[in-house]
């Protein structure tokens, strides 16, 4: 992996010498403070996993070049890093010498390479390699609660990705039907984080795991007032090694060997692998969502959207046997950035059904006389042999289901995925230089089917953000945030932050 990044960095340096215009660059100072070890929910969510702790003082710099979509062949690259101070937080770990669990202070790295990538495109097809922040392909990442499968909630994973640059016309449809799709394979670089935060008492830990992502969407002609987008996206974890602990003792080590065939089996999930469980279940850990967006454009260019995401962990969810589970939303986009309310999103989220409470497969219990099958207990983001769907403690999907960074007991699985609630996001301008964003949510959790809460936990989260653009210095802005959480799910957290940013363009490589 180190050789991979060395080669990628060499390519980036070489590319700068021949760069098309423009080259974007950014520098910012981020300072946050609060009453808790972790930042309030909205300050840490959908932010690339950069700010997770309550107190931070970070300096972040980056440079990037986007595709020139007017050319058949173009390329893109970027580098982004930050360094500074973040406070520590205690997580429980079993001490074999003392025979008990003890708190161990953990904190983010002092310096982080957030993004490093290079991309090429020819016509409508692209190839990308490296770490790049990626947002939801369909939903509003700025105002929404987060995509169920791919959001910008966690730090990016090193990967190779290929697909269509944007939606492409399907031949012989005269532009009335378009297609967009992507396929990616990568490898997690979170082994150190897992080993530092795991309790080593009970349960298991996965290291050396591979990552897969894929999606395919179809869209009707976007130039029409009414347009529909429908499709599916899926993500998976496979390979690596699972170590199982019981009462502080390592009882089992399961290596999941990865062969070339396993990559193909992740593209089209099927059973029959050589590893334990794969002979009866789909290869690795697979999850995904059915996605639908209906958009209507008014005569004044205002757009109204209604959308849903139907989550699934296996065939029962794909067949929509999980009731009303999903993300159900409405979006308003005035296309007038200076309006008092230029955009708004309202979402109702429910993940309580999960195809029922019971999972029973005859192959799991060969000595039983029961021949029936129950395909429930889907337990979103959890898997019977893989840790939660996350990277460095943060969910790769929606943060509305609390990430394992909240698990002070060092448990590597989601503890609250049976929950429901709402989310509201609004943005606009009070007057020309000052933009605002307001986020509000409420949720109620019953835990999981395997770990039911005796009493449901509730939570209310709020954030108000203002961004002031200095007219005197183009590209200079100051962002202020104030946020809180209230309730038993995430705790009572209060905090605020200031970010001073400067964005610029370099045209020295232009023709």
Language model features: what each stretch is:
Residues 38-44, 88-96, 109, 139-146, ...:
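Outer-membrane beta-barrel translocator domains and adjoining extracellular loop/strand segments
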């Amino acid at each position: 992996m180190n050789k991979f990044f060395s080669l990628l960095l060499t390519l980036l340096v070489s590319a700068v010498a021949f760069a098309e215009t423009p080259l974007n660059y950014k520098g910012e100072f981020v300072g946050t403070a609060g009453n808790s070890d972790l930042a309030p929910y909205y300050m840490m969510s959908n932010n690339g996993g950069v700010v997770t702790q309550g107190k931070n003082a970070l300096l972040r710099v980056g440079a990037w070049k986007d595709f020139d979509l007017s050319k058949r062949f173009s390329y893109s690259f970027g580098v982004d890093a930050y360094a500074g101070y973040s406070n520590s937080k205690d997580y429980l770990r079993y001490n074999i010498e003392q025979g008990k669990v003890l708190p161990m202070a953990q904190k983010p790295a002092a310096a982080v390479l957030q993004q490093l990538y290079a991309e090429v495109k020819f016509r409508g097809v692209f190839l990308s390699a490296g770490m790049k922040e990626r947002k939801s392909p369909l939903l509003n990442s700025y105002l929404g609660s987060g995509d169920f499968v791919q959001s910008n909630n966690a730090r990016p994973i090193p990967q190779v990705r290929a697909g269509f640059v944007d939606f492409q016309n399907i031949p012989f449809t005269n532009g009335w039907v378009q297609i967009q799709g992507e396929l990616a394979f990568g490898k997690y670089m979170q082994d150190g984080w897992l080993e530092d935060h795991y309790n080593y008492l009970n349960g298991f830990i996965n290291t050396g795991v591979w990552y897969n992502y894929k999606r395919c969407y179809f869209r009707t002609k976007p130039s029409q007032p009414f347009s529909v987008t429908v499709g599916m996206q899926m993500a998976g974890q496979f390979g690596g090694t699972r170590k199982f602990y019981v009462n502080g003792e390592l009882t089992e080590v399961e290596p999941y060997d990865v062969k070339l065939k396993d990559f193909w089996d992740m593209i089209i999930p099927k059973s029959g692998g050589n590893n334990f469980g794969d002979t009866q279940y789909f290869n690795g850990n697979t999850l995904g969502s059915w996605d639908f967006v209906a958009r209507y454009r008014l005569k004044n260019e205002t757009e109204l959207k209604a959308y849903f995401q139907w989550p699934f962990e296996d065939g029962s969810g794909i067949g929509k046997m999980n009731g009303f589970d999903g993300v159900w939303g409405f979006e308003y986009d005035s296309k007038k950035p200076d309006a008092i309310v230029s955009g708004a999103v309202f979402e109702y989220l429910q993940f309580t059904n999960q195809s029922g409470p019971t999972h029973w497969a005859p192959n799991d219990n060969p000595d039983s006389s029961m021949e029936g099958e129950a395909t429930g207990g889907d337990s979103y983001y959890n898997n019977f042999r893989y840790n939660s769907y996350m990277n460095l403690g943060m969910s790769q999907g929606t943060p509305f289901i609390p990430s394992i960074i909240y698990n002070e007991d060092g448990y590597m699985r989601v503890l609250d995925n049976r929950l429901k609630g709402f989310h509201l996001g609004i943005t606009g301008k009070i007057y020309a230089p000052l933009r605002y964003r307001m986020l509000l949510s409420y949720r109620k959790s019953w835990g999981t089917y395997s770990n039911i809460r005796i009493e449901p936990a509730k939570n209310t989260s709020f954030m108000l953000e203002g961004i002031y653009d200095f007219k005197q210095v183009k590209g200079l802005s100051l962002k202020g945030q104030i946020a809180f959480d209230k309730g038993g799910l995430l705790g009572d957290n209060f905090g605020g932050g200031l970010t001073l940013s400067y964005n610029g363009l370099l045209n020295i490589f232009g023709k």
